[in-house]
UniProtKB/Swiss-Prot annotation:
Taxonomy of the source species: Eukaryota, Metazoa, Chordata, Craniata, Vertebrata
Disulfide bonds: 167-215, 259-299, 344-392
Residues annotated with Phosphotyrosine modification: 488, 513
Protein name per the record: Cell adhesion molecule CEACAM1
PROSITE patterns named in the record: IG_LIKE
Region described as Disordered: 455-519
GO cellular component: adherens junction; apical plasma membrane; basal plasma membrane; cell junction; cell surface; cell-cell junction; ciliary membrane; external side of plasma membrane
Encoding gene, per UniProt annotation: Ceacam1
Organism: Rattus norvegicus (Rat)
Comp. bias intervals (Polar residues): 489-512
Tissue expr: Expressed in epithelia, vessel endothelia, leukocytes and platelets. Isoform 1 and isoform 2 are highly expressed in liver and intestine, moderately in lung, and weakly in muscle, kidney, and spleen. Expressed in granulocytes, lymphocytes, granulocytes, B cells, and T-cells.
Domain notes: Ig-like V-type domain mediates trans-homophilic cell adhesion through homodimerization and this active process is regulated by tyrosine kinase, PTPN11 and PTPN6. Ig-like C2-type and/or cytoplasmic domains mediate cis-dimer/oligomer.
Length: 519
């Protein structure tokens, strides 16, 4: 038996990676006294493949080492030995011609089979011929055939109770994994596995179960994957959807409708206008439409496999553009508290009416009433704030027009006063009222003081002519009859107040009389 290092130079070893590892270790003997161990690389081997029993930590100065089948060291179980002093190897009775021994203590197996699955023992004698033994074992697994997926129904219909897929062939000591569209499947509410995961069952079939299913067979040494299995779930059609959603169109525009319904296989499409078949396509196009094209448009879809059909109906109305309306008014100049009626006239039918005041949408008050169709506006009673420009707007779903403005003038009623006072006017009224009250109080105090202080004050009071008028009742002090005089003063106050509705008898002037008696 030749050394593996010599055979490697002639390129006769097929498993290049393992041989390179063993060869490198031949020239790299660790300077250590660690325990001798052996690893199987790989520990799980596919039949007819190779395995390397890789030795570690051989003594630097060993004499000889042996490889045996099993754990008993009898001569019949010897595979090979290596004698360091002679730098040569020698085969034993258990040698099969598939083994290669290396000077670093490793053993290489080619074309392993299930019978090779056992323990192997390395026995090393150090420089003093002390024996050192260690064992290793590897497992051999069959090569896996490419699996194949079969199903009880490759075209199930949505809603069917179940569909089953099977991964074949069956192999001992093999696990099976499933995926759909490249994503792993796990057991759930509608997904069950049986027969060691070889059978996949989908319950209550749904359209989402549609896709490509793969089965993977795997053992500790290798794996293999099936070709995709196409599960094509039949369903539909769903209720068709017509787009765009518009149902009102302008006369002269183009009508372009499309219909879509989710269905497998794809549904057949038919268009009906006012229940008459028009075309058997997914789209409907009519150019330069008129009001005669108004009506019901139906999309009918049919699935020839499921035998199901669905219909969606759309009512479409074609409108002409509206013309400009006009306003008729009973009177453009109205007295306050009177009434006025405005009427919006249009040649168009089926239109909506909206009123504008000073170019803004009219805010209705409790004095305003509209007719049922909004075409007539009545204001009663009218007030000065109702004066302004009035317009009416008519519209249909595709157009609108606004009338020319009508100006309404309101003649104020003088009895109604000025309904709107500025802040300055209000402040003036308040100040005037307060000043009047203060003046009255001062005068009353003055007269009271004069009365309690003596008659000499009478002359002083009557001397203030700009603000009072003085009158003397009875004879003067020079009169022989000596009749007591009665003096009185008249104060007139006239305060400006806001113009508010008052009765005709009300007077803006108030007179205050003060009487002073002389004792």
């Amino acid at each position: 038996m030749e050394l593996a290092s010599a055979r490697l130079l002639r390129g006769q070893i097929p498993w290049r990676g393992l041989l390179l590892t063993a060869s490198l270790l031949t020239y790299w003997s660790p300077l250590t006294t660690a325990q001798v161990t052996v690893d199987a690389v790989p520990p799980n081997v596919v039949e007819e493949k190779s395995v390397l029993l890789l030795a570690h930590n051989l003594p630097q100065e060993f004499q000889v080492f042996y490889w045996y089948k099993g754990t008993t060291l009898n001569p019949d179980s010897e595979i090979a030995r290596y004698i360091r002093s002679d730098n040569m190897s020698k085969t034993g009775p258990a040698y099969s011609g598939r083994e290669t021994i290396y000077s670093n203590g490793s053993l290489f197996f080619q074309n392993v089979n299930k019978t090779d699955e056992r323990a192997y023992t390395l026995s090393v004698f150090d420089q003093q011929f002390n024996p050192i033994q260690t064992s290793v074992q590897f497992r051999v697994y069959p090569a896996l055939q490419k699996p194949n997926v079969t199903g009880n129904n490759s075209n199930p219909m949505e809603g069917e109770p179940f569909v089953s897929l099977m991964c074949e062939p069956y192999t001992n000591n093999t696990s099976y994994l499933w995926s759909r569209n490249g994503e792993s499947l796990s057991e759930g509410d509608r997904v069950t596995f049986s027969e060691g995961n070889r059978t996949l069952t989908l319950l209550n079939v749904r359209r989402t179960d549609k896709g490509y299913y793969e089965c993977e067979a795997r053992n500790p040494a290798t794996f293999n994957r099936s070709d995709p299995f196409n599960l094509d779930v039949i369903y539909g059609p769903d209720a068709p959807v017509i787009s765009p959603p518009d149902i009102y169109l302008h006369q002269g525009s183009n009508l372009n409708l499309s219909c879509h319904a989710d269905s497998n296989p794809p549904a057949q499409y038919f268009w009906l206008i006012n229940e008459k078949l028009q075309t058997s396509s997914q789209e409907l196009f009519i150019s330069n439409i008129t009001t005669n094209n108004s009506g019901t448009y139906a999309c009918f879809v049919n699935n020839t496999v499921t035998g199901l059909s669905r219909t969606t109906v759309k009512n479409i109305t074609v409108f002409e553009p509206v013309t400009q309306p006009s306003i008729q008014i009973t009177n453009t100049t109205v007295k306050e508290l009177g009434s006025v009626t405005l009427t919006c006239f249009s040649k168009d039918t089926g239109v909506s009416v909206r009123w504008l005041f000073n170019s803004q949408s009219l805010q209705l008050t409790d004095r305003m009433t509209l007719s049922q169709d909004n075409s007539t506006l009545r204001i009663d009673p009218i007030k000065r704030e109702d004066a302004g420009d009035y317009q009416c707007e008519i519209s249909n779903p595709v157009s609108f027009r606004i009338s020319h403005p009508i100006k309404l003038d309101v003649i104020p009623d003088p009895t109604q006063g000025n309904s709107g006072l500025s802040e300055g006017a209000i402040a003036g009224i308040v100040i005037g009222s307060v000043a009047g009250v203060a003046l009255i109080a001062a005068l009353a105090y003055f007269l009271y003081s004069r009365k309690t202080g003596g008659g000499s004050d009478h002359r002083d009071l009557t001397e203030h002519k700009p603000s009072t008028s003085s009158h003397n009742l009875g004879p003067s002090d020079d009169s022989p009859n000596k009749v007591d005089d009665v003096s009185y003063s008249v104060l007139n106050f006239n305060a400006q107040q806001s113009k508010r509705p008052t009765s005709a008898s009300s007077s803006p002037t108030e007179t205050v009389y003060s009487v002073v008696k002389k004792k």
